Amino acid sequence: MKSIISLTAAAAIGVAMFVAPAFAADKGTVGIAMPTKASARWIDDGNNIVKQLQAAGYGTDLQYGDDDIPNQLSQVENMVTKGDKVLVIAAIDGTTLSDVLQKAHDAGIKVIAYDRLIRNSGNVDYYATFDNFKVGVLQANSIVDGLGLKDGKGPFNIELFGGSPDDNNAFFFYDGAMSVLKPYIDSGKLVVKSGQQGMDKVGTLRWDPATAQARMDNLLSAYYTDAHVDAVLSPYDGLSIGILSSLKGVGYGTGGQKLPIVTGQDSEIPSVKSIIAGEQHSTIFKDTRDLAKVTVDMVNALMEGKTPEVTDTKTYDNGVKVVPSYLLTPVAVDKTNYEKVLVEGGYYKADQLK
């Protein structure tokens, strides 16, 4: 997106974006470029990768770009200059890294795109991610099931939100969701009162919750003064919380105004709490522990001169090449299964969700 709940703005601003590298004597250092600390998800990713790489005997050089493209470019260039052996990059903007990746290639450094595909470069060696199309399918199925569309119920009003247009995953999420929702839209069982469809209309730059909240405010005032929105496709928990804030601000969730079905992604704690409270309807769980393991396995293979295991060699065309990829399976989470998936699975402790 990889897929954003956001931390408070004050906390995000207050966190230093430089993380001192930790070095191992034997195996060399792996550079890890993460996009932001303004999302709990990316903090978890960074911690999981560092923990597993260090356990495998590697030094780690973890940097967060603070959603600042030039900052991330500078960080990656420094990793190349310092001679990091492999780069693991979750790009802020997947289209901006071509020049620095050419330098990495010239220096013999392998590059793994981490959960966000790096585009327009032939120097992306592997991609570790989840089945992003399936993420969208699961989100849409949550809406279909929640509304009872398969039972012939409807019509219902729905509004659509997409992720950041500079994140390749956002298009997979949206396309996956629309593969399920479009037949219901075409038949009139789902009605997009705003008429806003397509990533050019519904995308949310940088996955920004405030932008999503402002757009939901505008949709409600322009199209729903005398109508009820029944569902909102949201691709990410951070957006979902902003959308729900907008809805609650005009009375949804009180009196006779039922909250619409609102989807999400990343199983961030505020959204899981919202699901438990009966507000957000669902989220998608992407186990970053497993993604870190796949990434470390790729690093090990590359450092040993072997070919990393992949599961997909056809889907992820970055505009220059089809990048060999390992796709993990996402899991839909709602009030009925969050304990089994998130608590019993060891991702969260029960008291974290209280």
Swiss-Prot record:
What does the record list as GO biological process?
A: chemotaxis
Q: Which UniProt keywords apply?
A: Chemotaxis, Crown gall tumor, Periplasm, Signal
Q: Say yes or no: keyword S-adenosyl-L-methionine present.
A: no
Q: Per its UniProt entry, which superkingdom is the organism in?
A: Bacteria
Which interval of the chain is the signal sequence?
1-25
Q: Which Pfam families match?
A: Peripla_BP_4 (PF13407)
Where it mainly occurs, coarsely classed, is periplasm
Q: What molecular functions are annotated in GO for this chain?
A: carbohydrate binding
Q: Which GO terms describe its cellular component?
A: outer membrane-bounded periplasmic space
Transmembrane region(s): none
Q: Where found, per UniProt?
A: Periplasm
Q: Check the record and name the CDD domains matching this protein.
A: PBP1_ChvE (cd19994)
List, alphabetically, the InterPro entries matched. Bact_Solute-Bind_Prot2 (IPR050555), ChvE-like (IPR049784), Peripla_BP_I (IPR028082), SBP_2_dom (IPR025997)
Give the UniProt family note.
Belongs to the bacterial solute-binding protein 2 family.
Role of this protein: Required for effective transcriptional induction of the vir genes by monosaccharides in response to plant signals and for normal growth and chemotaxis towards certain sugars. Functions as a periplasmic multiple sugar-binding receptor protein. It does not interact with a transport system.
Q: Which protein is depicted?
A: Multiple sugar-binding periplasmic receptor ChvE
Species of origin reads Rhizobium radiobacter (Agrobacterium tumefaciens)
